[in-house]
């Protein structure tokens, strides 16, 4: 016996013998699937500093619909003030996630969140990150398409020359 979403009548999980219904946000995928750490493919993302990485876990961030991504930022790297049009839920997977709110980077506004913490960020909220105490990994859950706009266009890595392979897709 599984459960279903009343509005879709598509079973999400029915046990090991069933679960073959496909989902609208994962075309061609069965309803039950898993992603283990060794399945995660980290790539450079043009809107991030060159040493930061992004991995698509579920969905397609550049398209309308639910998606889950992971973001890995090495020690001392800052993501300068930016905003996303979509509401987001961040879950800290590892390291300490420092996030502050505002249009200007201000270290005194940073809040530290340990692994397991969940941070809800409403769409169009200006914020910034800093890997202040070492590398961190966050998981972001949202409804796409993913958008990212820097508050100062000079902080946007897409305005600089980058030669490393990157995650493809349109980011508005």
Task: Show where each model-derived region lies.
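Glycine- and acidic-residue-biased ligand/ion/polar-headgroup-sensing regions
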Residues: 74-77, 83-104
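Extracellular/periplasmic catalytic domains that process cell-envelope and extracellular macromolecules
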Residues: 48-50, 61-63, 83-84, 91, ...
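Short acidic-glycine-tyrosine-enriched beta hairpin
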Residues: 103-123
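Double-stranded beta-helix
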Residues: 31-33, 108, 128-172
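Short beta-strand His + acidic residue motifs that chelate non-heme Fe in jelly-roll/DSBH
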Residues: 79-81, 99-100, 121, 126-132
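Boundary at the C-terminal end of the N-terminal hydrophobic targeting segment
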Residues: 4-8
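A short, N-terminal "cap"/entry segment at the start of jelly-roll beta-barrel domains
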Residues: 9-67, 154-172
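Conserved short histidine dyad/triad with adjacent acidic residue
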Residues: 64-84, 122-124
């Amino acid at each position: 016996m599984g459960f279903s979403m009343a509005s879709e009548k598509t079973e999400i999980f029915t046990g090991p013998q069933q679960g073959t219904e496909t989902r609208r946000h994962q075309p061609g995928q069965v309803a039950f699937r898993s992603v283990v750490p060794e399945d995660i493919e980290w790539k450079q993302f043009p809107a991030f500093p060159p040493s930061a990485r992004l991995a698509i876990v579920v969905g397609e961030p550049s398209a309308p619909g639910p998606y889950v991504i992971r973001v890995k930022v090495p020690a001392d790297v800052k993501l300068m003030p930016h905003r996303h049009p979509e509401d987001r839920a961040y879950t800290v997977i590892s390291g300490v996630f420092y996030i502050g709110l505002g249009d200007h980077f201000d270290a005194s506004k940073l809040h530290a969140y340990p692994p397991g913490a969940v941070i809800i960020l409403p769409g169009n909220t200006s914020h910034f990150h800093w890997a202040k105490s070492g590398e961190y990994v966050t998981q972001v859950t949202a409804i796409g398409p993913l958008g990212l706009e820097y508050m100062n266009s000079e902080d946007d890595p897409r305005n600089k020359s980058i030669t490393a392979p990157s995650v493809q897709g349109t980011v508005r």
